[in-house]
Amino acid sequence: MASSSSATSGDDRPPAAGGGTPAQAHAEWAASMHAYYAAAASAAGHPYAAWPLPPQAQQHGLVAAGAGAAYGAGAVPHVPPPPAGTRHAHASMAAGVPYMAGESASAAGKGKRVGKTQRVPSGEINSSSGSGDAGSQGSSEKGDAGANQKGSSSSAKRRKSGAAKTEGEPSQAATVQNAVTEPPLEDKERSASKLLVLAPGRAALTSAAPNLNIGMDPLSASPSSLVQGEVNAAASSQSNASLSQMDERELKRERRKQSNRESARRSRLRKQQECEELAQKVSELTAANGTLRSELDQLKKDCKTMETENKKLMGKILSHDDKMQQSEGPSVVTTLSIQVEAPEPHQGGHGKAS
């Protein structure tokens, strides 16, 4: 029973760093510091061993003598501390060792947004642990198990209260670490909003104005925004109407051009056909003219031959008349004259009968 109570009390209270130091309120933080110094005791001399610990570490029960004892007492000379802001907030940052108490590390970042809580004095924790130990010693084996359960629950509650105190009052070193490593919450939200606005793949509309009332109640929108939306809608409708009118005009112009081209092509084909017909008629007429000319030439030749024959006949007739007049009397001449003059109407078609 005594061993179980001592075990529970040992889990609740961290061991003292040096002789005569008070009990520590933050058990996890002190345990991580002791684990770090115990792990680094066998290594070479740490370059930051001679620096004095921050006042927060001295308040939590870790003195400079206890920290330097892991590397050998008096082995490293005193070195002046570096300027503010350059020292490491925790030993895990200097040597690259992961921080053992994850709750306190996350609580240091939350301390900026959560209000400060009142620190519970260490006397109350000691008194509560003492009362739990006394109750566990005075009970039986069955009661001892219940006391162990109560002690474990009380230790869990104390761990939670320690984490809450760590969240409420972060140390100065943790504040410096969070200020250096993590940007403020407002900067994160601002950068996130910028990233959302500047994300690739979101095309910007040129005609429509951006809507700034996304996720807001439409009933609570201001009348100016509603009027602006109506104006934008009217402008977009006007632009669409103008575009449609321009499209219709373009279509009409294209149709007119197409009809003009078709009419010009038809007229060109018609004129070409007429020209071909006229050329054919000209060729036919020239051929007919040639035949007529040839016939005319033939007629002229026939006329000339007939004229020559007529002249020969007339010469023969005249010579015959002269001979008849010389051989016969006047009666004969008269008869001959009558005979000669009688066929004149028959020979009048030639126009040269005497």
UniProtKB/Swiss-Prot annotation:
Ranges for region Basic motif: 252-271
GO annotation, cellular component aspect: nucleus
Major localization listed first in the record, in broad terms: nucleus
Biased composition, class Low complexity, residue ranges: 127-140, 232-245
InterPro entries, A to Z: bZIP, bZIP_plant_GBF1, bZIP_sf, GBF-like
Ranges of biased composition (kind: Basic and acidic residues): 246-265
Domain bZIP stretches: 250-313
Domain of life: Eukaryota
Key word DNA-binding present: yes
Protein's UniProt keywords contain Nucleus: yes
Region (Leucine-zipper): 278-299
PROSITE patterns: BZIP (PS50217), BZIP_BASIC (PS00036)
Annotated compartments: Nucleus
Chain residue ranges for the region called Disordered: 1-24, 106-193, 230-273
Pfam families: bZIP_1 (PF00170)
GO function terms (MF aspect): DNA-binding transcription factor activity; sequence-specific DNA binding
Record key words, sorted: Abscisic acid signaling pathway, DNA-binding, Nucleus, Transcription, Transcription regulation
UniProt-listed GO biological process terms: abscisic acid-activated signaling pathway; regulation of DNA-templated transcription
Function: Interacts specifically with the 8-bp sequence 5'-CACGTGGC-3'in the abscisic acid response element (ABARE). Also binds to the hexamer motif 5'-ACGTCA-3' of histone gene promoters.
PANTHER family linked: DNA-BINDING PROTEIN EMBP-1 (PTHR45967:SF31), G-BOX-BINDING FACTOR 3-RELATED (PTHR45967)
Family statement drawn from the similarity comment of this UniProt entry: Belongs to the bZIP family.
Subunit composition and interactions: Heterodimer.
UniProt protein name: DNA-binding protein EMBP-1
Protein's organism: Triticum aestivum (Wheat)
